[in-house]
């Protein structure tokens, strides 16, 4: 009898340990290289930490699709959810319910309102990323009165709109003669993005630059320029090196930026694992991530938020990268 009780206790402890270490990593949508790379980093970190990481997302970027996944993961007993939010507030009711049930909620890539999560794994502040967009463009645009188009995913997505707001403010301050002729959206759809990019180039034959801080919009703008045989347009923005490599090699794109999204996925899972094992992280605390280093929890104010609370903050990626013909082959994601 005593032996049976010992075996039963050991079995229950193993089951409990397995159930306590399940992390859901949710992109805006599946089938996009940027998000797949982030998911790969998340799963690599899970394997190294001995936790079970599930990567899944909607087939189209929608609040309802993400909410359904969040609810499913909560009902299945997952202990942490890390989501790239398609809306700053649309996911909040589902995420708040998850937190009430003891689930650790984090965001990565695109944030919710800060009160709807604990930690945001942030690729850069709006000032850093908006500034980088303008810096890449100004190095290629020689006209004092340049005509510029902005082209990205949607008018509601959190991260890209913050970057574009800062980029436009920088242009107004530092390049007051530049004219922003249009701001258009591809809605995370490759076909629509290509059609929209071609439409922009046709509508503005004297366009000097397209600024496209979106993983679908940037390659679409480059492909549109090639399809229409348009030269002399500076095409800059954010996407992954594997997607952009052919356009860089052909000279259609001279430079574009991003951050190491594989590292972002790894950092997110490491932070979630730290929350599960040791509890809240507060502003000023640090997290050690193997092969990356020590990362400090920053206040939400670095993202321009007014909300601060215990166990709530932002972990910034240590660096951003500008890719060009000289360095693009050093990266594979």
From Swiss-Prot:
A Pfam family annotated for this UniProt entry:
Peripla_BP_4
Q: Which GO terms describe its cellular component?
A: ATP-binding cassette (ABC) transporter complex; outer membrane-bounded periplasmic space
The stretch of residues making up the signal peptide is 1-19
Please tell me whether the keyword Cell division is annotated for this protein.
no
User: What subcellular locations does the record give?
Assistant: Periplasm
Instruction: Give the GO molecular function terms.
Output: carbohydrate binding
Q: Which UniProt keywords apply?
A: Periplasm, Signal
Self-association and partners: The complex is composed of two ATP-binding proteins (LsrA), two transmembrane proteins (LsrC and LsrD) and a solute-binding protein (LsrB).
Family statement: Belongs to the bacterial solute-binding protein 2 family.
Biological role stated in the UniProt entry: Part of the ABC transporter complex LsrABCD involved in autoinducer 2 (AI-2) import. Binds AI-2 and delivers it to the LsrC and LsrD permeases.
Report the protein name in the record: Autoinducer 2-binding protein LsrB
Q: Which organism is it from?
A: Klebsiella pneumoniae subsp. pneumoniae (strain ATCC 700721 / MGH 78578)
The gene coding this protein: lsrB
